[in-house]
From Swiss-Prot:
This is Photosystem II reaction center protein Psb30. PSII is composed of 1 copy each of membrane proteins PsbA, PsbB, PsbC, PsbD, PsbE, PsbF, PsbH, PsbI, PsbJ, PsbK, PsbL, PsbM, PsbT, PsbX, PsbY, PsbZ, Psb30/Ycf12, peripheral proteins of the oxygen-evolving complex and a large number of cofactors. It forms dimeric complexes. Keywords: Chloroplast, Membrane, Photosynthesis, Photosystem II, Plastid, Thylakoid, Transmembrane, Transmembrane helix. NCBIfam families: PRK13686.1. Its main location: plastid. It comes from Physcomitrium patens. Disulfide bonds: none annotated. InterPro entries: PSII_Ycf12_core-subunit (IPR010284).
Length: 33
């Protein structure tokens, strides 16, 4: 595999993994308010 392909896979993994975390943080902030 090329480094570019690996970099793209890592970027996609970070985006997919950070998605739910961001939603959870926003929900927590709204809950605290």
């Amino acid at each position: 595999m090329n480094l570019e392909v690996i970099a793209q896979l890592i970027a996609l993994a970070l985006i997919v993994g950070s998605g739910p975390l961001v939603i959870a943080l926003l929900a927590a902030r709204k809950g605290n308010l």
